[in-house]
């Protein structure tokens, strides 16, 4: 999968913790499906960590359903690109956190199912929203999100900008 960009200044030295993830890009017209944290007011693409026994695509389908209640149409899944994020760790177990975020374009069913949120996701009140990219970028870059990792929010904003530049959205916006 092609690399869209890399984030972080820390090199992957010392004790490294690697956590790959798969993320869903579902677009309809001038809007994209995103998870909105009502508690901290930020937007993220549905998706999350890839379990050891899963393929990227399996994780994409599972995580999108869990976080957003969206059912991915498996034969619509297409690679978009990867973002590598490196961060120094504040924990004692490892020195560097490495996350390869694999983004996939896909279509989703019109009907949604009940979310199956982790405790922190429920606490943050994760809600599916079909949002215009300009709005999600603005919120992620200008609102105080409390303790949330600003690098994650900037990653999502940059991916949205790439999608805009490549013409994936209709021009209603």
What does each model-found stretch correspond to?
Residues 71-81:
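A short coil-to-beta-strand element that immediately follows conserved catalytic motifs
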Residues 1-23:
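Acidic, metal-coordinating catalytic segment for phosphate/diphosphate chemistry
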Residues 41-42, 113-173:
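Nudix hydrolase/Nudix homology domain
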Residues 85-115, 129:
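Active-site-adjacent beta-strand/loop module that shapes the phosphate/pyrophosphate-binding cleft
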Residues 27-67, 71:
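Conserved Nudix-box catalytic region and its N-terminal flanking loop in Nudix hydrolases
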Residues 8-13, 84-86, 141, 145-151:
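Class I (Rossmann-like) S-adenosyl-L-methionine-dependent methyltransferase catalytic domain
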């Amino acid at each position: 999968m092609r690399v869209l960009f890399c984030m972080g200044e820390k090199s992957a030295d010392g004790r490294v913790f690697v956590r790959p993830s798969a993320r869903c890009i579902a677009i309809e017209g001038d809007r994209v499906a995103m998870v909105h944290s009502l508690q901290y007011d930020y937007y993220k693409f549905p998706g999350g960590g890839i379990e050891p026994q899963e393929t990227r695509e399996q994780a994409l389908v599972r995580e999108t359903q869990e976080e957003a209640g969206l059912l991915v149409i498996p034969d619509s899944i297409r690679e978009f690109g990867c973002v590598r994020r490196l961060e120094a760790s504040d924990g004692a177990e490892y020195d560097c956190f490495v996350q390869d975020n694999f983004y996939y374009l896909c279509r989703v069913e019109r009907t949604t199912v009940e979310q199956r949120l982790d405790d922190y996701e429920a606490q943050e009140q994760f809600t599916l929203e079909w949002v215009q990219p300009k709005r999600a970028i603005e919120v992620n870059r200008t609102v105080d999100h409390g303790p949330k990792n600003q690098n994650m929010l900037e990653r999502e904003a940059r991916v949205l900008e790439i999608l805009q530049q490549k013409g994936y959205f209709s021009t209603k916006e």
